[in-house]
From Swiss-Prot:
UniProt keyword list: Amino-acid biosynthesis, Arginine biosynthesis, ATP-binding, Cytoplasm, Ligase, Nucleotide-binding
SUPFAM superfamilies recorded: Adenine nucleotide alpha hydrolases-like, Argininosuccinate synthetase, C-terminal domain
Organism name: Escherichia fergusonii (strain ATCC 35469 / DSM 13698 / CCUG 18766 / IAM 14443 / JCM 21226 / LMG 7866 / NBRC 102419 / NCTC 12128 / CDC 0568-73)
Pfam families: Arginosuc_syn_C, Arginosuc_synth
Subunit architecture: Homotetramer.
Top-level taxonomic group: Bacteria
UniProt protein name: Argininosuccinate synthase
Classification lineage: Bacteria, Pseudomonadati, Pseudomonadota, Gammaproteobacteria, Enterobacterales
Single GO biological process annotation from the record: L-arginine biosynthetic process
Gene name as annotated: argG
Top EC class of this enzyme: ligase
């Protein structure tokens, strides 16, 4: 059976991930007119720029959907977001600022929950708005087929018949109007935005050019912290974790994690926390650029890692970072539920996150400017009395340190001999100033 259909399967049920925007509206109406039987599925991901979710399925029915369903994905999305924080599943960083993989997390949830809903309705063909140059086409492909082994893929934007008739937004708008729907195109922004409760992605158009900065973006989850006319008073916030799970903000507990994440977004968003500008590698190895918002994820991540560094030893922290980056890449590639990812997730959640209990108090200022004011945990292995510079009882003595220095550094003689051996072969140059052979200065090599 062919997995990817290049042309519209006339007379068959097709499930379309329906956002209510111009693209999916025109696609749904076109498919119905051409003889397919479209079913519309809309994911409620807590998108901060969506005002009326219930209206979206109603519009789908007006455009010819056989049936339209709104699938509440918020609880599962937040659960996956917290899991990503527990595992440090983030691999794109620039200058210490992190992209929290909020779009990949959203695709993992959407790609499984919508296809599961389609399967309930006997719909085994799926279409969405992803293009062939992006990451989402592969993410949705993988998650869809993981959920339904019988699934076939039909994407209008890979169908030459659809492209020839409705290849651009102007053509789609005219098509909708000609069919009796007063669909006016929204004002074109200088970039494209995709969002869910965990974060927002701004990319494409003017943002494809690196001389266009964050200053052209209107944040939808935060504030323009770079604009000095925007008043942003400093604010203290306390985050509490229990066994790796965020349970309270400023002493307030929440009935569910969705409400907790919304409050974290509000707190971080007041300062523009978690906004970053990243150049990344897409799945196809071409580089792209995005500007991201994730105020709640950033707030929880900062507090989590503060507790992490105070609780776990150096080797555990090193494995957390290494495995977290590896897991972040798998998440980015649409492999969040693959066995290699589950293995890493289980290890990090079981042996790292389970010990993260305590409170961190932060002072948030503008953007990603913050200070850590206090860290409290019964699990801290940070013991200031072990290293105090004051006179008093000590857990080890000067004689203990002499023994440690002797035993820990028995290889100094071997290292010295190797360095002079490298110098004899020309790999290193002798240094009269330091007495130790060193790599020759690049400027000297150029001469």
């Amino acid at each position: 059976m062919t997995t990817i259909l290049k042309h519209l399967p006339v007379g068959q049920r097709i499930g379309i991930a329906f956002s209510g925007g111009l693209d999916t509206s025109a696609a749904l109406l076109w498919m119905r007119q051409k003889g397919a039987v479209p079913y519309a599925y809309t994911a409620n991901l807590g998108q901060p720029d969506e005002e009326d979710y219930d209206a979206i399925p109603r519009r789908a029915m007006e455009y010819g959907a056989e049936n339209a369903r709104l699938i509440d994905c918020r609880k599962q999305l937040v659960a996956e977001g917290i899991a990503a924080i527990q595992c440090g599943a983030f691999h794109n960083t620039t200058g210490g600022l992190t992209y929290f993989n909020t779009t990949p997390l959203g695709r993992a949830v959407t790609g499984t929950m919508l296809v599961a809903a389609m399967k309930e309705d006997g719909v085994n063909i799926w279409g969405d708005g992803s293009t062939y140059k992006g990451n989402d086409i592969e993410r949705f492909y993988r998650y869809g087929l993981l959920t339904n082994a019988e699934l076939q893929i039909y994407k209008p934007w890979l169908d030459t018949d659809f492209i020839d008739e409705l290849g651009g937004r102007h053509e789609m708008s005219e098509f909708m109007t000609a069919c009796g729907f007063d669909y006016k195109m929204s004002v074109e922004k200088a970039y494209s935005t995709d969002s869910n409760m965990l974060g927002a992605t701004h990319e494409a158009k003017d943002l494809e050019y690196l001389n266009s900065s964050v200053k052209i973006v209107n944040p939808i989850m935060g504030v323009k912290f770079w604009d000095e006319s925007v008043k942003i008073p400093a604010e203290e916030v306390t985050v509490r974790f229990e066994q790796g799970h965020p349970v309270a903000l400023n002493g307030k507990t929440f009935s569910d994690d969705v409400e907790m994440m919304l409050e974290a977004n509000r707190i971080g968003g007041r300062h523009g926390l978690g906004m970053s500008d990243q150049i990344e590698n897409r799945i196809i190895e071409a580089k792209s650029r995005g500007i991201y918002e994730a105020p709640g994820m950033a707030l929880l991540h900062i507090a989590y890692e503060r507790l992490l560094t105070g609780i776990h030893n150096e080797d555990t922290i090193e494995q957390y970072h290494a495995h977290g980056r590896q897991l972040g890449r798998l998440l980015y590639q649409g492999r969040w539920f693959d066995s290699q990812a589950l293995m890493l997730r289980d290890s990090l959640q079981r042996w790292v996150a389970s010990q993260i209990t305590g409170e961190v108090t932060l002072e948030l200022r503008r953007g990603n400017d913050y200070s850590i004011l206090n860290t409290i945990s019964n699990n801290l292995t940070y013991k200031p009395e072990r290293l105090t510079m004051e006179k008093g009882d000590s857990v080890f003595s000067p004689d203990d340190r002499i023994g440690q220095l002797t035993m820990r550094n028995l290889d100094i003689t071997d290292t010295r001999e190797k360095l002079f051996g490298y110098a004899k072969t020309g790999l290193l140059s002798s240094s009269a100033a330091s007495g130790v052979p060193q790599v020759e200065n690049l400027e000297n090599k150029a001469k």
